[in-house]
């Protein structure tokens, strides 16, 4: 598999870590970040079984709401351009643990939906104690409010649907299906 990624973040300032240039990190998420990535699978190259092309584009931004906290927003879209078996299709990132995982769907089952083209969004509002700090006796706990809203909408073309074109495709596991016309929201 070969891959390339372009990243554009106007106004971002990177800082060196302990290992010098090889450990750059960003202290601020105020600058918008735009990414374009492409992965290519090559059949018969380094043991590759399939030719495929997968493209993703994303935009990420932190929106400050003064003393009311901030919203982290991420919008992503992607497409698989070729006929591929289901392990190479797009499956939304799911969270099966009890901890909060960024950019993951907490209520969706693993392998519930597959698609070869999709758009998703993740909005997380960090209220920084705006409500809980006003409740007497609770402020000393330093609890913070986090509200998230996420969505995923994808489609599966006929060439990648084993129910319509079974030649060369694996059947979906039980409980896995293409998305219908309704987006998934949580």
What is each model feature region?
Residues 1-186:
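Exposed, low-structure sequence patches enriched in small/polar residues
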